[in-house]
Amino acid sequence: MRGVADFDGIAAAYRWMEYASVGPMLERVRWWWLDRGELDGARHALVLGDGDGRFTRRLLQKNRQVRVTAIDLSRRMLGLLKRRCRVDKERLRTVQRDVRGEMPERGIDLVVTHFLLDCLADDEVEPLVRRVRASLQPGAVWVVSEFAIPAGTLRHPARLLVRSLYFAFSVLTGLQVSQLPDHTGALRRCGFSAIGKKAFWGGLLVTELWKLEPEAKSPGE
């Protein structure tokens, strides 16, 4: 992310921009673990950068016990999220701040980042993971959904698509990142283990489940 990207200008149109570029695929990716009951046991979720709130609303609807803290830098995106979740507003807390700052909660058992980590520079991911980790219960689960560059014949088309998306967001929001970070290495170094993965579109889109090992330590601890 480097400098602060401004998503306010595209908040109202973001859903339709998403549909125009990749259709409903990102929603399928977001819903994957939730619709299969993998998140039913969560009681306090930290949702970072959910944008207009479609995932947060679905989580609150499907899990009637969970409380959600949603953090986003964009005031307009948070406004859309709150309107979408107004029926369950008693179980929702919203915080407008840069996700690269300190986390405001403790006792989190579920973290969700859908298409957020790819907005960060490679050297920003591990510090974020360390800060989030300090807020988590042992055994907490982290859902990560991202674009990826698959091996094989789709590698070059995938690179072209990802490059074009980064260019579009640099123009529309001022995003300064231009390549996918290594989030898997950062999570492993901070004590998380991969427990599930689903790939879409030949590996161009992936959603993963990571679990914080009970005795894990972050680098430097």
Provide a role label for each language-model segment.
Residues P24-G41:
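Conserved alpha-helix/loop element of class I SAM-dependent methyltransferases that forms part
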Residues M1-A13:
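N-terminal, positively charged/glycine-rich alpha-helical extensions of SAM-dependent methyltransferases
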Residues C190-S193, K198-E221:
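Core SAM-dependent methyltransferase catalytic element
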Residues M103-V111:
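A short acidic, Gly/Pro-enriched loop at the edge of an enzyme's catalytic core
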Residues E126-P138:
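A short glycine-rich, Lys/Arg-flanked "PGG" loop and its adjoining helix->strand segment in the class I
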Residues S145-C190:
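C-terminal alpha-helical "lid/dimerization" subdomain adjacent to the S-adenosyl-L-methionine
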Residues H114-L117, S145:
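Residues lining the SAM
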Residues H44-L46, G51-G101:
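Class I SAM-dependent methyltransferase SAM/SAH-binding core
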